[in-house]
Amino acid sequence: MLTIENVNQFYGQSHILWDLSLEVREGTCGCLLGRNGVGKTTLLKCITGMLPIKEGQIKLNGRDISKISTEARARAGIGYVPQGREIFPQLTVEENLKISLGARDDKITRVPDHIYELFPVLLDMRHRRGGDLSGGQQQQLAIGRALVLDPKVLLLDEPTEGIQPNIVRDIGNVIRKLNKELGLTVLLVEQKLPFARKVADDFFIMEKGHTQASGAIAELSDDLVQKYLSV
């Protein structure tokens, strides 16, 4: 379970997150929704430790992780796929995946088989350079690299952005499998409502750095969409 309690965060003098609280239930997918600039990516970076919080707590299965380092949070079970994927273009697919092995406590030296089972294209292309992959394949690589950590919580920042429809479908299927079969908790930022409705169990709508509405994804009404998400 991932719990955010009364988190405040600033960029200089700008107050970005205001007493923000939410809870992602264990083994479910929660979706952060909101217009651009409301603090969704900032929240994910706060959870990873890339950005410090001024006040509040971030808890993983009841443990406060808000004061430990980014590396320690990764070891504790926080996996993260940022916008832009940030793979290493000169490294092979397999080398990109192996980068995450160093953060595992069991010190294994090979990519776990289930990563290739989730993303068969990565097995077929494991000796190709990351920069030679399509955008969709790079997104699969980025998710696979995060999963090599064997995380308890996976954070995804707009995983469908700029991705071809068939791979969007595959990514959605993987998220549901991670939830339902492997019990992984997922928190994703998403702009595409059809995708959010397909993969998410719960939603959290953000506006001005605060959670304005939340609930089961089936409760995401047209009125809420019009009020908080329409451009």
Language-model features: locations:
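Catalytic Walker B motif of ABC-type/P-loop ATPase nucleotide-binding domains
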Residues: 154-158
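Helix-to-loop junction immediately C-terminal to a conserved catalytic motif
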Residues: 48
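Conserved ABC ATPase signature
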Residues: 129-133
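ABC ATPase NBD coupling module
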Residues: 52, 64-85, 108, 112, ...
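ABC ATPase C-loop
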Residues: 146-147
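The feature captures the beta-strand-to-loop junction immediately N-terminal to the Walker
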Residues: 33-35
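Helical segment within the ABC ATPase nucleotide-binding domain
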Residues: 169-183
